[in-house]
Amino acid sequence: MPEVDVEILHETQSLCPVCLRRLDARYVRRGQSILLERTCPEHGTFAVDIWHERTEEDVTPPRFDGWSRPKTPSYPREPRTAVRHGCPYDCGLCPAHAQHTCTGLVEVTLRCNMACPICYAAAGGAVPDDPSPETVAFQLDSLRRASPGCNVQLSGGEPTVRDDLPAIIRMARERGFGLLQVNSNGLRLGLEAGYARKLREAGLDSVYLQWDSPDLEGCLPLRGTVALPDGLDLLAVKRRAVEQCTAAGLGVVLVATVARGVNDDRLGALLRLALKLGPGVRGLHIQPVARFGRYPGRLEDGLRFTLSDVMAALCRQVPQWLRMEHFHPPGCEHSLCSFSSL
């Protein structure tokens, strides 16, 4: 095989994925791929693709070293931890944290009514008891002191398995937060008539609805099989959930977990579906599969899909709507965490 040119772009710090030791690391360009490389004295060297600059079908993703957006640090108003051991061990948030909270994620349960093969929260199975209403109130009060008026996403697990979810939503609304959103797989929203309206009346604004593909073939490898009543399939229930939310006045954002070779060829079709389901559906959020929570052991070898891959796939699949210049680094989080578009 021909040798691949190697270029060290810059140095940074990272963690050993096994023991979480802080390590010196470097971003390296190898051919058309950008890798984050680090070596743990105990567990060896790790290298992971984080960006692809390849040209394919006249679609060229942005160069890695040009993908940045300078930001002025915005520190938390009330840090929760002191600086003792350095990043990330003091995080909680500490006084050195250079970004205030834009959206606070509050986990209200680790229970779930699905058992997805890929789950960022590793939810379901043997899980601890739900946090009490008093604990949730304490978390919301802490979040309000650190970043008053920020948006809040109630997450899990599956938040709708809690029968007191409307009370939790009211609790958050009473504390003056901005947008209130629930992260959901949509089962209860689609199957229980009137449930979406209950959440709306409690003060909910939006539902962050899991939806990986416009067809079952692209969903089942990520979600597994689900026992549903009346001969319904998973996508039929999700469509009902969108209808119920729209009728109740709740906005919906479709959220897709994308894995290479599973549903990466369906992103354009998913965008077309999101537009078709508007104005109830107001956005599409695409999350590349990640190596945390619950994931298959072969993830490193084949399923990884980078941000640049997402941008390139969208431009190839819906060229009439999207071009590479439509994508920009985010305004809140680190440039390598996400992108935004029109």
Stretches with model-predicted labels:
Residues Q32-A47, W51-E53, P61-R63, S68-S184, ...:
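Conserved alpha-helical substructure of the radical SAM core
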Residues A122-D130, P221-L232, E300:
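Short glycine-enriched, charge-decorated loop/helix-capping segments at active-site entrances
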Residues E3-E11, R29-S33, T109:
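Short, flexible, mixed-charge glycine/proline-rich loop motifs
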Residues E217-R223, G261, V281-D309, L322-L342:
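Flexible glycine/acidic-rich beta-alpha junction loops that bind and position SAM and/or redox cofactors
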